[in-house]
Amino acid sequence: MGDKGRSLKINKNMEEFTKVEEEMDVRRGPWTVEEDLELINYIASHGEGRWNSLARCAELKRTGKSCRLRWLNYLRPDVRRGNITLEEQLLILELHTRWGNRWSKIAQYLPGRTDNEIKNYWRTRVQKHAKQLKCDVNSQQFKDTMKYLWMPRLVERIQAASIGSVSMSSCVTTSSDQFVINNNNTNNVDNLALMSNPNGYITPDNSSVAVSPVSDLTECQVSSEVWKIGQDENLVDPKMTSPNYMDNSSGLLNGDFTKMQDQSDLNWFENINGMVPNYSDSFWNIGNDEDFWLLQQHQQVHDNGSF
């Protein structure tokens, strides 16, 4: 082996040693507030780039992949946090019937929501409920239950929430030296904190407002519109129309299934204490025995060719 060959081998071994050394020094586990601040400040100054290089330059003992996921899923200013709203639930169910598990495509129509968040919602809520019912989430039976029962019930809840919000003020005023923090943002850092420092940097000393996990402000206005995706799938900002799932003429609910709903006389949104929870995921608090009965009845109607 010549001198050149030995030199290349030594360099390769050194690179491998450095890589192993860096991996041993990589930090695992939850991100700290200080790490979040360092990542946000670095991206504010230099922008996004190659994440492995960014992690080294920002002096973060994290992998490039960890930095990328932390930024995209939690720290980006436009990321929306908090429970999936009723309107978002309806849209997810609607889009999934068209596109299946194409989470990135679905996320395009839910501003501020990441594909990972939507996927987790589907798996922890919809798939879990289908499993409890011993029903395949991809079966026609389960799809019909969503289309003819749960989605109309969601519409009812959205309309009820809209009516209940009429008496509430639709706006919040603050003095010029106050910041309004959306209660959906539960990140360590809120992008509004950037405004509190004329240099655009965040430090532990000036981030007391930013790291507040919950705001005292609550959403005062609930949209009265229930949106349905338009037919043009190529639109970046899709044309949205207001659906009417309760309209029998549309074929979504026929007379037999409406009678079946009336006979059930169920309150689909009560929890075990008989109280309606004040969070949006209460939609899935449905009694299993009642679901089984409806699934069986619906399957009989479907088998008889009434749909």
Curated annotation (Swiss-Prot):
Segment forming the signal sequence: none
The protein's name: Transcription factor MYB78
Cysteine pairings via disulfide bonds: none
Main location: nucleus
PANTHER family reported in the protein's UniProt record: MYB TRANSCRIPTION FACTOR-RELATED, MYB TRANSCRIPTION FACTOR-RELATED-RELATED
GO function term, MF aspect, one: DNA-binding transcription factor activity
Record feature DNA-binding region, as residue ranges: 51-75, 103-126
GO biological process: response to abscisic acid; response to salt
GO CC, one annotated term: nucleus
Compartments reported by the entry: Nucleus
Swiss-Prot/TrEMBL induction comment: By salt (NaCl).
Record key words, sorted: DNA-binding, Nucleus, Repeat, Transcription, Transcription regulation
Keyword hit for Flavoprotein: no
InterPro entries: EOBI/EOBII-like_plant (IPR044676), Homeodomain-like_sf (IPR009057), Myb_dom (IPR017930), SANT/Myb (IPR001005)
Domain HTH myb-type: from-to ranges: 23-79, 80-130
SUPFAM superfamilies in alphabetical order: Homeodomain-like
Pfam families reported in the protein's UniProt record: Myb_DNA-binding
